[in-house]
Amino acid sequence: MKIWTSEHVFDHPWETVTTAAMQKYPNPMNPSVVGVDVLDRHIDPSGKLHSHRLLSTEWGLPSIVKSIIGAARTKTYVQEHSVVDPVEKTMELKSTNISFTNMVSVDERLIYKPHPQDPEKTILTQEAIITVKGVSLGSYLEGLMASTISSNANKGREAMEWVIHKLNAEIEELTASARGSIRTPMAAAAFVEK
């Protein structure tokens, strides 16, 4: 078993970061995620948003890894459960693979919270537990997978910034459009009065 942990601070408020987290895929930084399906989404009586999603991924595994695990197929599926608490301002996301579970399990947990000293920033705490089962060189593969998770976490942070930039651009565009539509009737009314 290998445990990987990381902490990152986003220079954006919690509301922005959690909105981006829900819209993170697809993105050009991590093309291995090829599909996201929402299986269930509901708000519980206390106001928490619960989501259950299925992520489809396509991994380009090195040939040595394919030969060790005895699989040519690289499409895998991950189930993801998240809970967003808008009152406490926390988002907890847990994911686990549902493919190749007889050989490997990757259990990941992410927590997004406002930064305690600066509410305009958000802290992401991330942990992954990797267990390779019944395969020779198991600890080597766990280390390799931890390295891949670390690399993908960096890509994930870049993707979050990309989504946040995209969301901000959409907001600016909508704001400009709304301003234009307000000015047009006012200008027309001013023209009619003359």
From Swiss-Prot:
Pfam families: PRELI
GO annotation terms (biological process): phospholipid transport
Keywords associated with the record: Phosphoprotein
One cellular-component annotation, GO: mitochondrial intermembrane space
A Gene Ontology molecular function term of the record: phosphatidic acid transfer activity
Family, similarity comment: Belongs to the slowmo family.
Protein name as annotated: PRELI domain containing protein 3B
Organism: Bos taurus
Lineage of origin: Eukaryota, Metazoa, Chordata, Craniata, Vertebrata
